Amino acid sequence: MKSKKQILRLRKRAEFLTVRNGEKRRGPLFLMEVRERTEEESNAAKTGDNPRVGFTVTKKNGNAVIRNRIRRRLKEAIRCHAGRDMAPSTDYVIVAREQALNAPFSQLTEELSRRITAKGERRSGGKRRTERPEPGPVNGK
């Protein structure tokens, strides 16, 4: 029997804030923040190379009952399906959107798997920069 990868939870505010500085992967159901841990951080937290995940559901999404339901759906999707795709020594924070409540469970797991496996997808061109005119005479002077 194949052993399941143990997925640990982020619990402290400092851990969430550290992941916030990492890569952001946007989707229609949630925003995923991803950050690879250094070996020293893993040793300090005594987590080894297990992935860690944290969930954020803001009050904007509804009352406590609705927020907890969204959180439970995301946890189950990670536990059953998407957790196997998680990279070792990586922290994930999932910031849920209201659409995660009513989305079909299959769509939720597909979206999680897609965002977990997406490695640094960036739009072409990076930041936009406007062209500055060459310095020269003002008003023809």
UniProtKB/Swiss-Prot annotation:
RNaseP catalyzes the removal of the 5'-leader sequence from pre-tRNA to produce the mature 5'-terminus. It can also cleave other RNA substrates such as 4.5S RNA. The protein component plays an auxiliary but essential role in vivo by binding to the 5'-leader sequence and broadening the substrate specificity of the ribozyme. Residues 114-124 have a biased composition (Basic and acidic residues). InterPro entries: Ribosomal_Su5_D2-typ_SF, Ribsml_uS5_D2-typ_fold_subgr, RNase_P, RNase_P_CS. GO terms for molecular function: 3'-tRNA processing endoribonuclease activity; ribonuclease P activity; tRNA binding. It comes from Brucella canis (strain ATCC 23365 / NCTC 10854 / RM-666). Gene3D superfamilies: 3.30.230.10. Belongs to the RnpA family. Its EC number is 3.1.26.5. This is Ribonuclease P protein component.
